[in-house]
Amino acid sequence: MNNLRVRFAPSPTGAIHIGNIRTALFNYLFSRSEGATFVLRIEDTDLERSSKEFEELIFKELEWLGIEWDEGPDKPGPYGPYRQSERLEIYHKFAQKLIEEKKAYRCYCTPEELEEDRRKAVERGDIPRYSGRCRYLTKEQEEAFIREGRKPVIRFIIPDDEVIEFEDMIKGKITIKSDTLGGDMVIVKSDGMPTYNFAVVIDDALMKITHVIRGEDHIYNTPKQILIYKALGFEIPKFAHAPLILGPDRTKLSKRHGNTYIGQYRELGYLPEAMFNFLSLLSWSPEDNVEIMSKEEIIKKFNFRRIHSANPVFDIEKLNWMNQQYIQKSSIERIVDLAIPHLRRAGYIDGIDDMVYNWLKDVISLYKDGLQYVAQITEKAKMFFVEEVEYSDETVKILNSPNSKIVLEVVKKVIEEADEITEEYVKDLLKKLQKETKVKGKEFFMPIRVAITGEDHGPELVKIIPLLGKDKVINRLKKAINLIK
């Protein structure tokens, strides 16, 4: 490790959005490719919405994806504590320092006064900003407000007519004027809790963070933070703002585009290495443009300079294709183990012994290479777990085609007389019955397939019939025969 330090600082207020996970991933890849220290910090100052359950979920999702951190709440380091709720005294100390140096002040404005100021600014056609009403209060005025029961916030003084410039590692030079920042900003709320822009500067400075890598939705926070860095005499880190991920309609990725939380993909049976691979390619690509890469290969090839500024599109079809490649390369045992919870939730299985497990391996192996995500198995392999299959209008037409009844009755009779149904037995049987009935090809196979599966396509009959078992096959053949007019 060298002196480079990066951090991922989520709030434990809900499930982790895909965009936040991509931010964590870029910080992780930077740390591992550059030999930097990767810090996990929990920003839990929103006491009402923060919870330990969501904090545990953050750990779980990062670990599932294979993102390891070097310092954090569970991995003490030299710059802890790593939860903001445990650092309140530190923030108060620096807020007081700013007040003493006349760089911040207590503000007693009521919400009604602030709303009235905002309304008047809008009426004038101005950008709403704090008026600075409390910047120069006398001691007597402050005491009067306190007697009224007003609880102050602490505001940081935003200088007038200052130009803040910084070199973004992804977007290049960014220039923002101080008069667009909304006026003197609140850094400590009336309940004593620090605001995001204040706490994040204190934490990043004291934790020696050298590179702040985050989403571009933070760009307008950066000049405010730079002003606080300067006011406190802290060294300013390098900033990188990754482009936001868009949905297929090129608007910001949201719930209307489908699943937007990493946990939803984990629960559906997407593989962590596929998600790691896919997310790494949202705004970054290796020089050789290879798409399927292991975690180790991505780390080896990762170069921060190859992150581009254009907004990437979250292409679910691309993710499904990529996940399918990883499923195909996985062992059947791994996919069965991932499928079992889905099959249980569907009510298809209960207890599992070695015989059932081996049967599941045989069933799932029929579909494994075609799965885009593991949860699809409950629908694709449904016919193996239900007693009866349903027939659509289209499949009923197939059952009513010429010779169907003859074929189904002959197959039923022979299977009823069989002692054991194996793949070899079924293969020989179907070959023999085509000769006996003089019905061949699709005209022979399709009625059988539809009768026992309810579908007009799928895995080979010679594999399906032994796995379904004699009783199910006979019952379905009987039902189909009775449907034929």
From Swiss-Prot:
Main localisation: cytoplasm
Annotated residues for binding of ATP: K255
InterPro entries registered for this protein in UniProt: aa-tRNA-synth_I_cd-bd, aa-tRNA-synth_I_codon-bd_sub2, aa-tRNA-synth_I_CS, aa_tRNA-synth_I_cd-bd_sf, Glu-tRNA-ligase_bac/mito, Glu/Gln-tRNA-synth, Glu/Gln-tRNA-synth_Ib_cat-dom, GluQ/Sye
Any GO MF annotation of the entry: glutamate-tRNA ligase activity
GO BP: glutamyl-tRNA aminoacylation
Catalytic EC class: ligase
Domain of life: Bacteria
Location of the motif 'HIGH' region: 10-20
GO CC annotation terms, alphabetical: cytosol
Subunit structure: Monomer.
Functional description taken from the UniProt entry: Catalyzes the attachment of glutamate to tRNA(Glu) in a two-step reaction: glutamate is first activated by ATP to form Glu-AMP and then transferred to the acceptor end of tRNA(Glu).
Listed NCBIfam families: gltX_bact (TIGR00464)
Protein family: Belongs to the class-I aminoacyl-tRNA synthetase family. Glutamate--tRNA ligase type 1 subfamily.
Protein name: Glutamate--tRNA ligase 1
